[in-house]
Amino acid sequence: MPELPEVEVTRLSFAFEIAGARVISVRIGKPLRWPLGCSPTQLAGRSVQAVRRRGKYLLIDLDQGLLLVHLGMSGSLSFARQLPPAGAHDHFEMTTTLGTLRLTDPRRFGAVVYAKGEDAPEAHKLLGKLGMEPLSDDFDVDRFHDELKRRRAAIKQVLLAGDTVVGVGNIYASEALFMAGIRPTLSAARLSRPRSARLHAAIRDVLARAVATGGSTLRDFSSAKGENGHFQLEAMVYARQGQPCRVCATPIKSLRQGQRSTFYCPHCQKA
């Protein structure tokens, strides 16, 4: 699943080019996770003001309302002046005066949802319960620690839930916990203030480096320009079960948490 870095990389790869474009037409393919919420013809004539991100959602601001885009498990966006003919997995296509934006999603867990502009976007039901943005000033270390002290679940599970800090998916949760020296199964409530601060810094660092390297391409992720990410090449623990830790040479181990694979170093993450 594309996580925060992949969504941010996607945003950066087309936000500037599409700003100011006028929508000519919208084509809908097979049903996605949620319906569009309006007739495609209603979007014709709207102009694109900006493209923002909230967690793993892209927010395409229009002069009237906005489009919420979620890439689901396997989705990706493409944007170009001219794209090849739509294929079997291309389920949303918005043609504009500056190019065509297309959502390709083989598993169809992604979605494009229109939201009217009467209310603040943050109030939308898909966004209202999201946690702090880890790459913004909103991600306050004291608030982060206070939130963790109220959670008895394993720290890895708390990070994945998205209601404390948003967008830290499976890859980057494992990496951040390694950097902070915290065992993934430790109860979040047991983290001291200094350890919460180390995790806070590790989350910001890992996500920033992932964005800078284009995200992680494990299977089919690419930016809206078709470029693959490279963060997976420098991962410290993720998908490295049995390989030596890059710090201490102890073999990396894995375990299952909530039906997701977690990777960690038993020496560097003793507690």
From Swiss-Prot:
GO terms for molecular function: 8-oxo-7,8-dihydroguanine DNA N-glycosylase activity; class I DNA-(apurinic or apyrimidinic site) endonuclease activity; damaged DNA binding; zinc ion binding. Coiled coil: none annotated. Pfam families: Fapy_DNA_glyco, H2TH, zf-FPG_IleRS. Binds 1 zinc ion per subunit. InterPro entries: DNA_glyclase/AP_lyase_DNA-bd, DNA_glyclase_Znf_dom_DNA_BS, Formamido-pyr_DNA_Glyclase, FPG_cat, MutM-like_N-ter, Ribosomal_uS13-like_H2TH, Znf_DNA_glyclase/AP_lyase, Znf_FPG/IleRS. It catalyses: Hydrolysis of DNA containing ring-opened 7-methylguanine residues, releasing 2,6-diamino-4-hydroxy-5-(N-methyl)formamidopyrimidine; 2'-deoxyribonucleotide-(2'-deoxyribose 5'-phosphate)-2'-deoxyribonucleotide-DNA = a 3'-end 2'-deoxyribonucleotide-(2,3-dehydro-2,3-deoxyribose 5'-phosphate)-DNA + a 5'-end 5'-phospho-2'-deoxyribonucleoside-DNA + H(+). Disulfide bonds: none annotated. DNA binds at H89, R107, R151. Signal peptide: none annotated. GO terms for biological process: base-excision repair. The active site is at P2 (schiff-base intermediate with dna), E3 (proton donor), K56 (proton donor), R260 (proton donor). SUPFAM superfamilies: Glucocorticoid receptor-like (DNA-binding domain), N-terminal domain of MutM-like DNA repair proteins, S13-like H2TH domain. It comes from the Bacteria. A zinc finger (FPG-type) spans 236-270. Keywords: DNA damage, DNA repair, DNA-binding, Glycosidase, Hydrolase, Lyase, Metal-binding, Multifunctional enzyme, Zinc, Zinc-finger. Belongs to the FPG family. Involved in base excision repair of DNA damaged by oxidation or by mutagenic agents. Acts as a DNA glycosylase that recognizes and removes damaged bases. Has a preference for oxidized purines, such as 7,8-dihydro-8-oxoguanine (8-oxoG). Has AP (apurinic/apyrimidinic) lyase activity and introduces nicks in the DNA strand. Cleaves the DNA backbone by beta-delta elimination to generate a single-strand break at the site of the removed base with both 3'- and 5'-phosphates. PANTHER family: FORMAMIDOPYRIMIDINE-DNA GLYCOSYLASE (PTHR22993:SF9). HAMAP family: Fapy_DNA_glycosyl. Monomer. This is Formamidopyrimidine-DNA glycosylase. The lineage of its organism: Bacteria, Pseudomonadati, Pseudomonadota, Betaproteobacteria, Burkholderiales.
